[in-house]
Design a protein with these regions (language model features):
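Second-shell loop/turn segments in exported
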Residues: 11-19, 100-104, 150-152, 177, ...
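Alpha-helical metal-binding/catalytic segments enriched in His/Glu/Asp
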Residues: 32-33, 103, 115, 189, ...
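Soluble metallo-hydrolase cores and metallopeptidase-like ectodomains found primarily
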Residues: 61-67, 71-82, 86-88, 138-216, ...
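Extracellular/luminal Protease-associated
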Residues: 65-147, 151-153, 312
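Metal-dependent peptidase/peptidase-like ectodomains
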Residues: 198, 247-346
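N-terminal capping segment at the start of a domain
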Residues: 1-22, 35, 132-143, 208, ...
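His/Asp/Glu-rich mid-to-C-terminal helical/loop segments that flank catalytic regions of hydrolases
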Residues: 231, 343-407
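Noncatalytic luminal/extracellular "stalk/propeptide" segments of secretory-pathway proteins
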Residues: 1-98
C-alpha cells in the first residue's frame, strides 16, 4: 500500500456533513475493497446550518466573524463582557451582556451557567495574534451542549480582533444572525475481517476534518493506520475477528462513534476491545497510549513496548476521541497517538497538511500497532477485563457532561 497516496487523495477540507466528507468515506470504502475486505457505509443524522447573514458590530464598527451553525437566528445587543474565567464570580457578571471568552468553544456546564446567568450571546476567539493569517474557524453550537436550554447566538472572531476589543474598551456589541438549520447526514465506514470466534476487536479512527483543515495529521493518519493494519492482517488466521470503523463527525463531539455504538448496541457484548488511532506518524512527537480499561492493559502496553523496543508512554484515563463512546458502553478501549504538539504539527487549522507527516515513521507506528492488534486477535481468550474501573467511569461521566468536574 502506498501510504502517501492516501494523504494525496484526501488533501482537502472534509468537514462533518459535507459532500467532501462523503467523498472521503467512499474513498476509504474503496480502499478496503481493494484490499479484499468487505466494507459498507452507515449514515447517521447530524445537525447542520447554512449561514445566510452574519454581522458583528463593536461600537458601530463591523468586526469580521463566523457565526456558529445551529445557534439559531436573530439579533443580540448589549455591553461587551470579557470573561477569561468560568468561575461562579465571573459567570455572575454575564447578565444582559455579550460575553467574550478566551477559548474557541464551550462545554455543557459553562453554557448552562451562562444561559441561567442571563447572557445574551457568546463570542469566542480563534487563532494566534502572532500568526500572519487572520483565519476564523466555522464551528457549531452542539446539541449536547445546549441540552434543554435555549440557544444563545454564538460567533467566532480572530484572536487579534478579540485583543483589540478589550484593549480599546469597546462598550456596545451587536450580533446579527440569519441561518437555515436542517438535518444533514454524516457517515461511518465499516469493514470486517472475520475470525474463528463470534467475537471481534473494533479498530476505530475518525476521518473528518475541521472546517479549515485538510486533516492529514488529524486524522487521515489514523485512517492510514487502520488500512495498514488491515493490509497486514487480511490474509492471516485470527481467533478474534477485526471490525474496522472509520468514524465521521468526530470533530463535532464524537458523533460517528456515538452513532456506531448506538446502532450496534446489541453487538457490543461481542466486542472484546476497542483500539482507536487518532494522530500518528509525524516526524516528531511522543507515542502515547491512553487506556480506558483496567490498569493491567496499560502495564501490558508498556511491557510489550519495552520488549519490542518501541517507546510508548502509557497511562489510564479518558481520551478525547472515538475510544470514549466504546468505553462508556463497557467495551475496554485504548487510544494510541503520536503527540507532536502545535509547534510541529498544529491541528484544527490551515497548517494540518501532509507535509507534517513522515511516511517512514507512520510505517513504524503501523508495525507496532499491527503487532499489538495481532496479539489480541490471536489470544485464546482476550485477557482484558470487561469491567470498566470506577475512576474511569467517573472520568467518563465528567467528559460526557453527566457530572460536573470538580474544580
Amino acid at each position: 500500500m502506498n501510504l502517501k497516496n492516501i494523504f494525496e487523495s484526501t488533501d482537502f477540507v472534509h468537514a462533518s456533513g459535507t459532500k467532501e466528507e462523503l467523498q472521503v468515506a467512499e474513498y476509504l470504502k474503496g480502499q478496503c475493497e481493494e484490499l479484499g475486505v468487505k466494507a459498507w457505509i452507515e449514515g447517521f443524522r447530524v445537525a447542520m446550518g447554512d449561514i445566510e447573514e452574519a454581522h458583528l458590530y463593536a461600537d458601530g464598527s463591523q468586526v469580521k466573524c463566523r457565526v456558529f451553525t445551529c445557534c439559531g437566528s436573530g439579533a443580540a445587543e448589549g455591553e461587551l463582557y470579557y470573561m477569561p474565567g468560568i468561575d461562579k464570580v465571573s459567570i455572575a457578571g454575564a447578565k444582559d451582556k455579550i460575553v467574550l471568552m478566551d477559548v474557541g468553544g464551550v462545554g455543557f456546564f459553562t453554557y448552562q451557567d451562562l444561559v441561567k446567568a442571563g447572557a445574551k450571546a457568546i463570542l469566542f476567539q480563534y487563532g494566534n495574534v502572532h500568526y500572519p493569517d487572520k483565519d476564523i474557524e466555522q464551528r457549531d453550537l452542539r446539541e449536547a451542549v445546549v441540552g434543554e436550554e435555549k440557544k444563545l447566538l454564538c460567533a467566532m472572531i480572530n484572536a487579534a480582533d478579540a485583543v483589540e476589543l478589550v484593549k480599546n474598551g469597546v462598550k456596545n456589541v451587536r450580533l446579527e444572525v440569519a441561518q437555515k438549520e436542517y438535518d444533514g447526514e454524516s457517515h461511518n465506514v465499516v469493514a470486517e475481517i472475520p475470525g474463528e470466534r463470534d467475537e471481534y476487536i473494533v479498530l476505530s479512527a475518525h476521518y473528518d476534518s475541521t472546517t479549515l483543515s485538510h486533516g492529514a495529521y488529524d486524522n487521515m493518519s489514523g485512517c492510514a493506520g487502520l488500512l495498514g493494519i488491515m493490509e497486514k492482517l487480511r490474509d492471516k488466521k485470527l481467533n478474534y475477528g477485526l471490525r474496522f470503523v472509520f468514524c465521521g463527525s468526530e470533530e463535532r463531539g464524537l458523533l460517528g462513534s456515538k452513532a456506531y455504538v448506538k446502532a450496534h448496541e446489541e453487538e457490543l457484548e461481542k466486542s472484546a476491545l476497542n483500539i482507536n488511532l487518532d494522530m500518528i506518524g509525524t516526524y516528531m512527537g511522543k507515542f502515547i497510549a491512553c487506556v480506558s480499561a483496567e490498569n493491567k492493559l496499560s502495564h501490558y502496553i508498556s511491557y510489550m513496548a519495552a520488549e519490542v523496543g518501541f517507546p510508548v508512554s502509557s497511562k489510564t484515563g479518558v481520551y478525547s476521541s472515538d475510544s470514549t463512546p466504546f468505553a462508556d458502553k463497557g467495551v475496554p478501549a485504548v487510544s494510541f497517538a503520536r503527540i507532536a504538539g502545535g509547534n510541529v504539527a498544529p491541528i484544527h487549522c490551515r497548517y494540518d497538511l501532509m507535509d507534517v507527516m513522515s511516511m517512514e515513521q507512520l510505517e513504524k507506528d503501523i508495525e507496532f500497532l499491527t503487532l499489538f492488534t495481532e496479539r489480541f486477535a490471536n489470544a485464546v481468550v482476550c485477557p482484558v477485563s470487561r469491567e470498566i474501573p470506577e475512576d474511569i467511569k467517573k472520568q467518563l461521566d465528567e467528559y460526557l457532561f453527566r457530572k460536573r468536574k470538580e474544580q
